Amino acid sequence: MTKNSSTVFTHARIATLEEKAANLGLIEEAALVVKDARIVYAGPENKLPGEYASFEKIDCGNRLITPGLIDCHTHLVHAGNRAHEFELRLQGATYEEVARAGGGIVSSVRNLRAASEDDLVRETLPRLDALIAEGVTTVEVKSGYGLDRDSEIKSLKAARRLGEERDVAIRTTFLGAHALPPEMNGDKAAYIDRVINDMLPAIAEQGLADAVDGFCEGIAFLPDEIARVFDAAKAHDIPVKLHADQLSNLHGAALAASYGALSADHLEYTDGDGAAAMASAGTVAVLLPGAYYFIRETQKPPVEAFRAAGTKMALATDNNPGTSPLTSLLLTMNMGATLFRMTVEECIAGVTREAARALGILDQTGTLEIGKDADLAIWDIERPAELVYRIGFNPLWKRVFKGQI
């Protein structure tokens, strides 16, 4: 591991992922220069300024440099697993049937409440390590398995500690409106009161949330209930995002757009109006093919409608114990292509530039541009398409986080 803050990566091919660049912004025979954890040059090697001649050099051997990958939707902090529910679904039970029978999210709540913060960190690190091993440099982590003030705070603190234990950027999201805890006896209005009057103020005061999320679905919370949470988030000046239209069309995409949400996620049942509303609001569509695959969904998100509307699309693992126990963004890209018919360029942009946009950090990372964080992944491949094409193969050569290998 090098601690040199000034490095030139030579003999490289660079996919900058710049916004308007064609073909992933690919530059052949390129060099990239890092100084003080920032990118200071990314371009043709034969135009490399002489001022960098004394910097440490790393010969990339014509390998491909991309931005470090970004997993923009995870529930990485959880306790235990739900393999038994996997077996139930194989026997024919639906996601909704499992949830209504007391399984699903509520079973994860029991496990998380019983775990200590240290337990959560210890159990989560192997999942995080699996992502890091594939070139991931930023991970979004949601709460939502505590569903009371102390447990939600515990989850968010555990998530923040992940960034202290590993060289990775962590973005935390408060997902109090994830499910109704059993002690509320079906009283959703009273629970939303707790979310906005008890949990959110404490979390905001401690600065533990970079965003606020909700689950807008018949088995979770209806649009008017989510709107109350979003109004409270806006009062605390915290951006919002939404689990929307996964199992039915409750017009969650349009709701998210009406609040200027960073993203709306899942979106299998979103219609053309929802796609257009998201495009107008700049709300990113975060597609989660792992969950689609794992629960054997048949309704695909409207990728063509998103393209037609100009809605930006990101991809994420949705790592969670019940519906997407997935810790591979490389496999997620392949699923985005094979299941949702996304292009190679859409898939790679979806785990770099558009994932950064979905987290509100595109000004810091997600592309290889001067002034941005030196978060890089260097791949031993001949074509960018290999990142999407291969299954069960990791061609990562080096991962660079804030300029450090």
Swiss-Prot record:
Enzyme class: hydrolase
Pathway the protein acts in: Amino-acid degradation; L-histidine degradation into L-glutamate; N-formimidoyl-L-glutamate from L-histidine: step 3/3
Family matches, as InterPro entries: Amidohydro-rel, HutI, Metal-dep_hydrolase_composite, Metal_Hydrolase
Cellular localisation: Cytoplasm
Entry's Gene Ontology cellular component terms: cytoplasm
Cofactor details (free text): Binds 1 zinc or iron ion per subunit.
Keyword Cytoplasm: yes
Gene3D superfamilies for this protein: Metal-dependent hydrolases, Urease, subunit C, domain 1
Pfam assignment, any one: Amidohydro_1
Source domain of life: Bacteria
Family annotation (CDD domains): Imidazolone-5PH
Residues holding Fe(3+): 73, 75, 243, 318
Cofactor(s) this protein cannot do without: Zn(2+); Fe(3+)
Swiss-Prot/TrEMBL keywords: Cytoplasm, Histidine metabolism, Hydrolase, Iron, Metal-binding, Zinc
MF-aspect GO terms: imidazolonepropionase activity; iron ion binding; zinc ion binding
Catalytic activity: 4-imidazolone-5-propanoate + H2O = N-formimidoyl-L-glutamate
Sites where the protein binds N-formimidoyl-L-glutamate: 145, 320, 322
Positions bound to Zn(2+): 73, 75, 243, 318
Swiss-Prot/TrEMBL GO biological process terms: L-histidine catabolic process to glutamate and formamide; L-histidine catabolic process to glutamate and formate
Entry binding sites for 4-imidazolone-5-propanoate: 82, 145, 178, 246, 323
UniProt EC number: 3.5.2.7
Family of the protein in this entry: Belongs to the metallo-dependent hydrolases superfamily. HutI family.
NCBIfam families, alphabetized: hutI (TIGR01224)
Stated role: Catalyzes the hydrolytic cleavage of the carbon-nitrogen bond in imidazolone-5-propanoate to yield N-formimidoyl-L-glutamate. It is the third step in the universal histidine degradation pathway.
Protein name in UniProt: Imidazolonepropionase
Originating species: Brucella suis biovar 1 (strain 1330)
